[in-house]
Design a protein with these regions (language model features):
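A short, structure-level motif marking secondary-structure boundaries and short turns
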Residues: 229-232, 270-272
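Acidic/aromatic-lined carbohydrate-recognition and catalytic surfaces
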Residues: 261-272
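Loop/turn elements at helix/coil->beta-strand transitions in domains of secreted/extracellular proteins
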Residues: 222-226, 252-257
């Protein structure tokens, strides 16, 4: 948990972490010259009191990850509304179909929050995976910049996993950016009251996902057909055409579990 020097908001509700009774964890803490060391049976965090850097270590003292001092920059949180006016709506055609745009929105400051940055130092051959579903086809995010925002087929998740055997779950529901280049490696958080993240240490990816599920709750599995091949096209013009698609896949022996009648099939103006 990282704050700006003000009061820690321990009681704030999380939209990510499951609300349940968590058992107490045995740990030890000691303060040496210039550092505080917190240990459990599996993980050790060494905090530099002067710089704010954190080194995450295995129980045997070998290093997992180095985190440099984070940044918190104060920012205004702005909401937009029409006040007492009736909304003036313009219907505009976009590449994603027709959209409603309200023309008479007014900006209103509702509170002050922070923009945050978590800086990390990865090992040279370390790979970083996760961050949800994107459209660029990036497997290993090392050397890449990835904007994490919700849109259509973009489904970001504030969690990453490393081939070094750990994961980072950031308790953040705002826009985020992952960046790794020659200058800096960081996670940018657009709007937070404080930075809360969970270090999930393990020996295998399964152990990391176990910890992730423990913190966020059990996810319901989709029906089996949803894991097969899904055929989607902007428009099928007739039922005959759609059925011929299915017959063709059956003929060539390619499993097909779902055919999507996409947006050009739907009634104009009745979808978002």
């Amino acid at each position: 948990m990282i704050v700006s020097g003000k009061e820690i908001k321990e009681a704030q509700d999380s939209l990510i972490i499951e609300k349940k009774e968590y058992p107490e964890v045995d740990f030890s803490a000691e303060e040496n010259a210039g550092s505080i060391i917190v240990k459990t049976v599996k993980v050790c965090a060494e905090i530099n009191t002067a710089s704010g850097d954190i080194i995450w270590k295995h129980a045997d003292g070998s290093k997992w990850l180095s985190q440099k001092k984070p940044e918190l920059t104060e920012t205004d949180v702005i909401h937009y509304n029409t006040g007492d006016e009736e909304p003036i709506i313009n219907r505009v055609k976009t590449v994603d179909g027709e959209r409603n745009f309200i023309q008479n929105l007014k900006a209103e400051k509702v509170r002050t929050a922070y923009r945050g940055k978590l800086f990390f130092t990865w090992k040279e051959d370390e790979e970083i995976h996760g961050l949800g579903q994107a459209e660029e086809g990036i497997y290993n995010y090392r050397g890449h910049c990835q904007y994490l925002y919700q849109h259509n087929m973009r489904i970001p998740m504030p969690v990453l996993v490393s081939t070094e055997g750990y994961g980072i779950l950031v308790d953040c529901c705002s826009l985020m950016t992952f960046n790794d280049d020659l200058k800096d490696s960081y996670l940018f958080l657009d709007t937070v009251d404080q930075i809360d993240y969970y270090f999930m240490g393990g020996h295998t990816m399964d152990e990391i996902i176990h910890d992730y599920r423990y913190l966020t709750g059990k996810a319901q599995m989709l029906p089996k057909w949803a894991y097969g091949y899904v055929q989607s096209k902007e428009q099928y013009y007739t039922a005959k055409e759609l059925l011929e698609i299915v017959r063709h896949y059956r003929k060539i022996g390619v499993p097909l579990d779902c055919v999507v009648q996409d947006w050009n099939t739907w009634d104009p103006g009745n979808w978002l």
